[in-house]
């Protein structure tokens, strides 16, 4: 009889796996340790493979011996000991000479067809080798083309190594919302880095499905604000693929397409496009396109296409050899009319998302959020070759909160670094670095002029009016690419533009020599704002007019600009107006007039003030700008006198804050507002406390409104997860002493820190402060601020509720707090010290508080390593008749049955205790038996007992039944996450049916119960409707 082959044997083992185990096997196979020297199997081939196919793939990729070893290892990993033992005994005898290594021939480029046996595989080896040769040639070309980038201010011939300069960007999978489609530059300080948590995404998983049952992703859209790093990320993807670091087994070819270049070229075919990417004029186009599923087209800058994708354009191209207009060619690829099986990666600004969305079928949207705080630091250290300079520059920017926030945008980070380096090289102080967008751009422009010398500066001043009018014309007409005729229309010549190229004001397109653009959209907005400020001298009289030949919209009347603000499609005017406010700052105006030898209008200041006055008094701002946007404009100016005049017109302020920048901006404006009577602030991600639904009152979670007496201003009571820092809190806390209506303050999830807490404590001790409830969870506090908190506790009788959870106070910090808690004037009723790094050492101090503080009724000290000894110390004082504690939380405190005797003594003697939380402590059946003694005592008044996840088994059934039968006070019992078993639960149901059982709520979540027990529970619920039974069956 012929021996069974290894492949058949392996397939036979895999057939023993149920569907769930087979999925686990594939998952472990995908994550098989690379150090074991095995070749990974492409996910696309593996996910649809059945038992036989999977066995074939494993052997074809790694040979029989390694495949068998992999299977044995994975059987153990998925807890199939039966198969593991059987496979070890049944292991074939290997012949090293016959070990299959054929799969290594095409290791760089995986075969996409199913493997159909060794004979078919051998017949394709020669084809695979040829394909590999073409791939190698093209990869080398891509490496050469993309290994370096040219810095924006680089001299001729200078470039920067992309791998050395590139800093990782934050990528998240999100569906674009209306807010995300607003003008991209408004995302400065508004990204969701400090908002709700998001699912980050790795580049290698871009085209992988979120669920293994779903089809692979074929279209990915990178969206992000201008300057956020879309293009450099696209180039990095090209380089990593060429280096074999990315998509190695997924794509044979990646083609980089500049959307704006393609749309401006003469009609070309897809074949022409590939030829333009190839290192020589004769690429194997037919062979490349014969497998479109192995091709990725990377389209950079969809939003920069000229006139493409209008709704009325229906012309498409389905022939890869047919020459068509560039926009039609790209449209056909995107709409999957041409090469429908090819994959696409498209980068775009948010403003073009709506237009793009209608063309795509099930795309994956990935948002580029820019740099995290850690990556900003990394970027500084990569930009500055000198580590001391990098450290000094980063420290300076980090101290400047608003500018540090703006640096999450890579372009702004580059501008800041460039400006700082320029100052360092000239030996000037870095203290002049400003904190507004306008100041950054003015400083950068100044740096450019200084680096070019006096003659260039004089030329720039002469051509500045034309440059500004060109920018404004482009803004009004939504135009970013200009031809030479556009330059001439605004008094500019081609020779003038070459000077701007050197100064980095303009960027000449590499392959589109007849077209010019500002190097970045924000530069265009900046110069457009200057257009409304510049005055011209004409026969001794100062006039303000637009260049000859420009449209009527280009008159210099700023009223026209402001009237259209908010109405203009896509919000292109938003940043122009912000820059306008920043440029009319008097010091900045004087600086620009001197530096650029120009005359700047003072009339614009009055027009801006009138505009703010009208908007401030409007009953409801149905259109842009919102009040917060007006505040951003005022903040950009940085003139307190002007801001005070403007804010004097606000009778009511209603704004929603979500970022650090929002807080800084609003704080700057609100502190200069002396007439506002009502302030309503909305915040993101407010969440109620787990245990006390009533403690929040009736205020809505998303907005709290406070009315303040003139002339002082305060803030809303709810500031959860708003990235507050001490700079914002000073303005907030100063109002606590005068606002009589503010009684609740929630500062949870803010980087308050000990310095901010000290500022808050000063305000809380003021006689005029009426704060009663204060929540400070996760505020970065340590023992260093506990003395200040203790002083508040000993001086303020108004404070009745304090939450300090998730702060590393430690035992020493609690000892300091206890000094205040024991003070006669302390009136605190509720205290949370959950997860505060406490041990049994602090329990003696807390015990003294329990016996001396008669107001404290609720103490939550769970998630701390108190241990049995610590709780025993607490219990000694809780037996004191003077102890008024009603609720005690000891969740996950490292307790065992050893502390249950002490707890039983408390239950027998303390009739005040009504709630006891013992969740996630290994009390066991013995612990419950000891507690049962106290619960059956006639003096026990406990109403709520939480024993979730306390290691109880069916042996506790008798004690639980006894408690339910005889305890007359217990109303709520949580037994979830315990292994009670079906029989015990059915027994409890019978007890609960009795008339003498007064329990109102029973929780049995996460129990392994059968269907019969489930029906018994449902029947109990119907028979006794006053009893609530919560059960979540785990199978």
From Swiss-Prot:
Domain FISNA: 138-208
Name this polypeptide is given: NACHT, LRR and PYD domains-containing protein 3
Pfam families in alphabetical order: FISNA (PF14484), LRR_6 (PF13516), NACHT (PF05729), NLRC4_HD2 (PF17776), NOD2_WH (PF17779), PYRIN (PF02758)
Modified residues (Phosphotyrosine): 13, 134, 138, 166, 860
Gene field: Nlrp3
Membership in a protein family: Belongs to the NLRP family.
Swiss-Prot/TrEMBL LRR repeat ranges: 741-761, 770-791, 798-818, 827-848, 855-875, 884-905, 912-932, 941-962, 969-990
Motif annotated as KFERQ-like motif 3, chain positions: 797-801
Region of interest (Required for binding to phosphatidylinositol 4-phosphate (PtdIns4P)), residue spans: 129-132
Binding site for ATP: 167, 224-231, 520
Highest taxon of the lineage: Eukaryota
Span(s) of short sequence motif KFERQ-like motif 4: 990-994
Motif (KFERQ-like motif 2): 603-607
Organism: Rattus norvegicus (Rat)
Lineage of source species: Eukaryota, Metazoa, Chordata, Craniata, Vertebrata
Role according to the record: Sensor component of the NLRP3 inflammasome, which mediates inflammasome activation in response to defects in membrane integrity, leading to secretion of inflammatory cytokines IL1B and IL18 and pyroptosis. In response to pathogens and other damage-associated signals that affect the integrity of membranes, initiates the formation of the inflammasome polymeric complex composed of NLRP3, CASP1 and PYCARD/ASC.
